[in-house]
Amino acid sequence: MEQFSAFKLLLKKQYETTLGFYDKYIKNLKRFALKNNVLFVIVDNEFARETLNSNPDIVGLASKLYDDIRAVRFVNEQDFFINLAKLEEDNRETLYQSSGLSKNFTFKNFVVGDGNRRVYEAGVRISETQDADFSPLFIYGETGLGKTHLLQAIGNDKFFHFPNAKVKYVVSSDFAQEVVNAFYQKEKDQGIEKLKAAYESLDLLLIDDTQIFGKKEKTLEILFSIFNNLVSKGKQIVFVSDKTPDELANIDPRMVSRFKSGLLLKIEKHNLSSLCEILAVKLKEKDPNIQITNEAREKAAQISGNDVRSLNGIATKLLFYVKTTKQNLINNDNLKEILFEEFEKFHKKSFDPYLLIENVCRRFNVPVDSVLSENRKAELVRVRDVCNYILREKYKMQFQQIGKIFKRNHSTVVAAVKRVAKMIEKDDSLQDIITSLVI
């Protein structure tokens, strides 16, 4: 308010030769706002507005009191609020454009399962509050489990709850390039300080692929400084990595210590149910009219190698098939034709016996944990035997490997396989079920 009072005095000197102008139109001005380096002032009188807006010297007067001022606009009350709303909207769009986020990654299309529930809950907490209780949050897990999706969803949801928040999503390699670019500026020190100032002004910093930072000493030095500054100001940082902090190669122990100073959470592999749901979400996003049978969806999920990116590729292939053949239904028969390469790759190296076991348990409606336990209930023994049979006869696993999964000895597995072989001789329907379960 003191600055604005001083600004009015400068206007008084500017218009001291215009009789009564200051006393009548300027002296009692009170309502103003400074937005995006533009000073807006409410002036009720149209003559006064036109007079003031046509004076090119006024922005120079304002610049004596306000840093980086680029314009002064005298407006009526209605235009005042319209301009502010427009500037607010523009400011939010500018903030989002500079965030590095993609609107495709949200919590709405993020599938939550047992393997990622804890990191999801931590992410929601970060996005919905201005607290930094978990700073830094360090998320790690194998590639293809949805870590990038989660990281960007945190940023997008933060904007939903706090539209004026300063958020930045950056891949570690891009951050390293920013540091290199800053060093190659004419004024190297100014370039580095400008980079640090930009990052240190953030409310939420999201860094992807943290494991790539290894051997980039200068980059880590800059990151170390930014990290300390943000944490000291109570701001939130989230790191994502394929490895735990202790497994990161060639990284300064001080930085490793910082990574471990907050909340450390792991994203686990998806179960079959989650993979099926993820595939359903991706198909719906690509074309709501695509239909896929439960059996086909389960097989497509199983050959994904527990990789969300692979699932997206599978969904894209299914979309291509639907668009080119005009057939909206994906079933067991055309699935193997569409995903021929994926099935071949799966049989060579990607087979996950636990996904097969989960699929069998779903078919017989029994819990996976019970089948993997010591429980000897007849219905569980039967399902366990079927799993043993499929793993041995259809996927050629060694008896010892199968026994390790079910915590059974060699002879027990052999007996289970023989029991199912005899049951198949008497019951053709069991053979049909087993055939449908084999990928």
Swiss-Prot record:
Residues 1-72 are annotated as: Domain I, interacts with DnaA modulators. PROSITE patterns: DNAA. The gene is dnaA. Oligomerizes as a right-handed, spiral filament on DNA at oriC. Residues 72-99 are annotated as: Domain II. GO terms for biological process: DNA replication initiation; regulation of DNA replication. This is Chromosomal replication initiator protein DnaA. Residues 323-439 are annotated as: Domain IV, binds dsDNA. ATP binds at G144, G146, K147, T148. One of its GO terms (cellular component) is cytoplasm. HAMAP family: DnaA_bact. The keyword ATP-binding applies. It comes from the Bacteria. GO terms for molecular function: ATP binding; ATP hydrolysis activity; DNA replication origin binding; lipid binding. Keywords: ATP-binding, Cytoplasm, DNA replication, DNA-binding, Lipid-binding, Nucleotide-binding. The keyword Cytoplasm applies. PANTHER family: CHROMOSOMAL REPLICATION INITIATOR PROTEIN DNAA. Belongs to the DnaA family. It holds the Pfam family Bac_DnaA_C. Domain I is involved in oligomerization and binding regulators, domain II is flexibile and of varying length in different bacteria, domain III forms the AAA+ region, while domain IV binds dsDNA. Plays an essential role in the initiation and regulation of chromosomal replication. ATP-DnaA binds to the origin of replication (oriC) to initiate formation of the DNA replication initiation complex once per cell cycle. Binds the DnaA box (a 9 base pair repeat at the origin) and separates the double-stranded (ds)DNA. Forms a right-handed helical filament on oriC DNA; dsDNA binds to the exterior of the filament while single-stranded (ss)DNA is stabiized in the filament's interior. InterPro entries: AAA+_ATPase, Chromosome_initiator_DnaA, Chromosome_initiator_DnaA-like, Chromosome_initiator_DnaA_CS, DnaA_C, DnaA_dom, DnaA_N_dom, KH_dom-like_a/b. Residues 100-322 are annotated as: Domain III, AAA+ region. It is found in: Cytoplasm.
